[in-house]
Amino acid sequence: MPEQVTDQENQAPQQQTTAVHAYNPEVLQDMLPVYYRRLFPHLPFYRWLSYGSSEDAIFSNREISFTLQDDIYIRYLCFDTQAELEKEICSRNPIKIDIGPVMHSKPKNHRSIPGGLTPVQRELVFDIDMTDYDEVRTCCSGAGVCLKCWKFMVLAARVLDVALREDFGFEHIIWIFSGRRGIHCWVCDYQARHLDGRGRYAVAEYLNIITYASFAGGNSPRCSMGDRPHHSLKRALKIVEPMFEEIVLEDQNLFGTPKGVTKLLNMVHDDAARGELESYMQKNLEDGAHSRLVWESFIKYANSMRTSTTSAWSRKLKNIVAEIQLGLLYPRLDINVTRGFNHLLKAPFCIHPATGKVCVPFSVSAVAKFDPTTVPTITQLLHEINAFDDKSKSYMEAPEDKSRIKDHKKTSMFKGVVVFEEFLRKLERSQKSASLQF
């Protein structure tokens, strides 16, 4: 079952959205020192990547990369302690931090290692980008995202999370908002981290069910369920089907134009059947009919044709309705990210330079309540700290008092840290339990 997180994550502080606190990319470099010094969760970040020091050199051999101002990219960084990493972050104030694999030797010595570095472990990661849904969303495109198209990410997280837990037995999964238009999934179980290249390829291929057929107007998503649909496809269908009408027919009105009707027709993977369906729709639908009417007409025709034992609709198209629903709503994975051992992925709690938003963790059990349009920006966070301190004067009165409230608790970033720390507690409990068995 999806991971449960305390109710605190849903108790977002009041957010300031006035133009006065709008994010300006030109002053990001001026704000990052304050963010890294006062808000970035250095200790939880270290606790995650060190995994309780359960394995030799698991932290010190981890490759970290920084992207600095003016696109200066520094790879092969590594650190022996949490203090070293924190000092370097606060000194360089990177615009982005990327996390790579744990190597067989310290990455900083890569030039002197015969044969180069060899990765020995790495979290199993998934990257889902909203731009891969541009062909099936009409509300936004490119870097744009709104609450309507965020529902594609809601379904992606739900489908993928339950598959990873039920089909592979993974437990320690953290979901991260990418800061702009996508989501990242980190699977941190020991077995996942130690998968070899073939194992990662197998997992990626198992979960990547969408294929594409080329037509004059572009690529058409396809999902073949076969004569005996796999249980994972049946489970995914149970998740996406209840939201199909809301997302595809209402929010996106995907079939509400001639181009949209063509998208639907192109998903019928039989030339003769497609031609028959097109003729039927031309006779029974007006141009520009709402998607709901188009879909109802399609369902009516498909059901009537299934009664013919000689028709493709009763054989290879018998699951066409479910295949279209999955083809439009199933997670669209960048499988090269998952298959690759050396891929570096953006770290949680980075600031996206284009939007200024924090790459915050979220709970999959509350993903439908997650609003990407109100994720706090660095500008907003610094204002929230100042507003809190001006009100309480606690920061000025007790700068060295260890009992004073932590800065992230003064801001709307707090709920993301709560999600992350709850994930860490479960991960660390599991590691302690495993160590007691030896």
From Swiss-Prot:
<keyword id="KW-0548">Nucleotidyltransferase</keyword>
<keyword id="KW-0808">Transferase</keyword>
<keyword id="KW-0235">DNA replication</keyword>
<keyword id="KW-0479">Metal-binding</keyword>
<dbReference type="InterPro" id="IPR014052">
    <property type="entry name" value="DNA_primase_ssu_euk/arc"/>
</dbReference>
<keyword id="KW-0639">Primosome</keyword>
<dbReference type="GO" id="GO:0005658">
    <property type="term" value="C:alpha DNA polymerase:primase complex"/>
</dbReference>
<protein>
    <recommendedName>
        <fullName>DNA primase small subunit</fullName>
        <ecNumber>2.7.7.-</ecNumber>
    </recommendedName>
</protein>
<dbReference type="InterPro" id="IPR002755">
    <property type="entry name" value="DNA_primase_S"/>
</dbReference>
<keyword id="KW-0804">Transcription</keyword>
<dbReference type="GO" id="GO:0003899">
    <property type="term" value="F:DNA-directed RNA polymerase activity"/>
</dbReference>
<dbReference type="GO" id="GO:0046872">
    <property type="term" value="F:metal ion binding"/>
</dbReference>
<comment type="similarity">
    <text>Belongs to the eukaryotic-type primase small subunit family.</text>
</comment>
<dbReference type="GO" id="GO:0006261">
    <property type="term" value="P:DNA-templated DNA replication"/>
</dbReference>
<comment type="function">
    <text>Catalytic subunit of the DNA primase complex and component of the DNA polymerase alpha complex (also known as the alpha DNA polymerase-primase complex) which play an essential role in the initiation of DNA synthesis. During the S phase of the cell cycle, the DNA polymerase alpha complex (composed of a catalytic subunit PolA1, an accessory subunit PolA2 and two primase subunits, the catalytic subunit Prim1 and the regulatory subunit Prim2) is recruited to DNA at the replicative forks.</text>
</comment>
<feature type="short sequence motif" description="Zinc knuckle motif">
    <location>
        <begin position="139"/>
        <end position="149"/>
    </location>
</feature>
<feature type="active site">
    <location>
        <position position="127"/>
    </location>
</feature>
<keyword id="KW-0862">Zinc</keyword>
<feature type="active site">
    <location>
        <position position="63"/>
    </location>
</feature>
<dbReference type="GO" id="GO:0006270">
    <property type="term" value="P:DNA replication initiation"/>
</dbReference>
<dbReference type="Pfam" id="PF01896">
    <property type="entry name" value="DNA_primase_S"/>
</dbReference>
<feature type="active site">
    <location>
        <position position="129"/>
    </location>
</feature>
<keyword id="KW-0240">DNA-directed RNA polymerase</keyword>
<dbReference type="GO" id="GO:0006269">
    <property type="term" value="P:DNA replication, synthesis of primer"/>
</dbReference>
<comment type="subunit">
    <text>Heterodimer of a catalytic subunit Prim1 and a regulatory subunit Prim2, also known as the DNA primase complex. Component of the alpha DNA polymerase complex (also known as the alpha DNA polymerase-primase complex) consisting of four subunits: the catalytic subunit PolA1, the regulatory subunit PolA2, and the primase complex subunits Prim1 and Prim2 respectively. PolA1 associates with the DNA primase complex before association with PolA2.</text>
</comment>
